Design a protein with these regions (language model features):
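Alpha-helical cap/lid subdomain in secreted, periplasmic
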Residues: 1-113, 117
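Extended, basic/helix-rich recognition subdomains
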Residues: 111-129
Length: 129
């Protein structure tokens, strides 16, 4: 970031980091946003999705799908509000489509090709507007 100029820098936390380490997530989000702006770029939060409903990963995490989605949504939106940043809310779109389209890879955590396409479309829309 220091050696090149960027228009935007996309910030994505580990899948459950905004929930399991919320204070650290918010603190580091602020620091990163400051550094990004110092270099003339705009930070953008890439808000991720809950683990696949009914999947083993979600079961072992100890939350239901709605709860994980809500906590991720709240953490990412709080970080975006506090830091006055753009947000590419991919997690919200995954949630809206959860009972209509399979967006997950076999691990129930990462996106499949369709999920990746939707994520790319949302990010592009945020950056273009």
């Amino acid at each position: 970031m220091q050696n090149e100029k960027w228009d935007f820098v996309i910030l994505q936390e580990m899948s459950n980091g905004p929930i399991t380490s919320k204070a650290s997530f918010l603190e580091n989000a602020e620091k990163l946003c400051e550094k990004i702006r110092e270099n003339g770029a705009k930070p953008v939060f890439y808000a991720t999705w809950a683990y696949q409903c009914g999947g083993k990963k979600l079961e072992t995490f100890g939350m239901d799908y709605d709860e994980m989605y809500q906590k991720l949504y709240e953490a990412y939106h709080l970080a975006a509000d506090r830091n006055h940043t753009l947000i590419a809310d991919v997690g919200k779109k995954f949630y809206e489509l959860s009972d209509k389209v399979n967006l997950y890879a076999d691990d129930g955590c990462h996106p499949n090709e369709k999920g990746s396409q939707i994520a790319a479309e949302i990010i592009a829309e945020v950056l273009m507007n």
